[in-house]
Design a protein with these regions (language model features):
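Conserved helix-adjacent loop modules within structured domains
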Residues: 1-191
Length: 191
């Protein structure tokens, strides 16, 4: 009496034990955060073409670089990247809501099918827009593959892409009248 079947207490102990703490990577040293030669090459081409005042470069990790540009230059810079560097398609378009800054950042992850030497590289092209009147020029005329992704960003974050062929609903119900669901102030009803 009072004894548990063999093995049961072991499984209960395993269920109730806390999960292991996540490990964090140490911060990058200055040397580790510098861009490798290939990334430096295409970054220098972009900066020399448009100037340091129009582009902010953030090296992320090998094969991945992020540049942030003012939205008024995004079409011109995206076209240069496509025509001169060989990044020929938008692999995805993502967005992040920054309510404290009253901004939404939209990031195009650019890749290449046509140039084998950069096929593994991803160039993230980012820009920001005012959250209250979230409008950006479309990049569908530069990267046809951005069409679907911009539609999703329009619907989920409320960013209107000027010149886009179809800024309309396709995932949410047509009568959706609430905030875009990926905005940080969106609340699920009843919670």
């Amino acid at each position: 009496m009072g004894q548990e079947p063999k093995g049961k207490s072991d499984s209960v102990a395993n269920i109730q034990s806390p999960p292991p703490k996540p490990t964090t990577s140490p911060p990058l040293s200055k040397k580790e955060s510098e861009s490798p030669p290939f990334e430096k090459e295409y970054i220098s081409k972009i900066v020399s073409q448009f100037g340091e005042d129009k582009i902010r470069v953030a090296y992320i990790r090998p094969l991945r670089t992020k540049i942030t540009v003012d939205s008024s230059y995004i079409i011109e810079i995206a076209t240069f990247i496509r025509d001169n560097l060989g990044f020929d398609h938008a692999e995805s378009v993502t967005g992040t809501d920054y309510p404290k800054d009253n901004q939404i950042e939209v990031i195009y992850q650019l890749g290449s099918y046509s140039k084998e030497d950069i096929a593994a590289h991803v160039l993230s092209l980012a820009t920001r827009t005012n959250r209250d009147d979230a409008r950006l020029p479309t990049l569908t005329n530069v990267f046809k593959s951005a069409e679907y992704h911009e539609r999703e960003t329009f619907e989920m974050l409320g960013v209107y892409f000027e010149g886009h062929p179809r800024n309309d609903r396709f995932l949410l119900p047509e009568d959706w009248a609430d905030l875009p669901p990926l905005r940080k102030d969106f609340r699920i009803r009843g919670r």
